[in-house]
Amino acid sequence: NLINHIPFIPISLFKSHRIIRTGGAESVVFESSGTTGMKSSKHFVEDEEIYRKSSLNYFQSIFKNVEEYTILALLPNYLQKGNSSLVYMVNEFMKCSKQTQKGFYLDDWRALENQLLDLEGRGQKTILFGVTYALIDFLTSFDTKLHNTTIIETGGMKGRKEEITKQAVYEILGRYIPAEKIYSEYGMTELLSQA
């Protein structure tokens, strides 16, 4: 049974030890967001292709062909920190997309708004990934309904705002996006999981 070959270790070891196969060398190191005020975890990944393929396969199991979508991202604290598995994943989706308009946004909401309006006007299928607090701030300052855009909120207020329930998040986002176009995506750096 292969499960017996997997060493089970506490998540806390990713904060204090270099966890990798004996003799292995990392091709990429992902770092957790560290939003709990604690030391960030580090995941030393020997074969980043495994993460790339698993993320893409999961994405396409839900949304089908990534090539058809314009991929945008509003992930300010992740971009500023660097080494984020979430940023890596979204960047890979952008590379796979056949659409020319794609990109990450920090705080240029006017440019993001203009791009979304252009894409909406053309009926282009669009996915906007965003950390919850940034999506709420952006959409509440942006008084237009989006019909061709899917929102994937990546969770949390990241210490920027008071935490609110998932239902409250969906109620706020639902004022701007149809409920069936709102998704949640959460990952755990230590497990290379994005779901």
Give the ranges of each region predicted by the language model.
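Active-site glycine/GP-rich loop and adjacent strand/helix microenvironment
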Residues: N1, E68-T70, E92-A195
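Nucleotide 5′-phosphate-binding alpha/beta core
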Residues: N1-E68, L72-A73, N77-L79, N83, ...
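Residue(s) in the substrate-gating loop at a strand-loop-helix junction
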Residues: L86
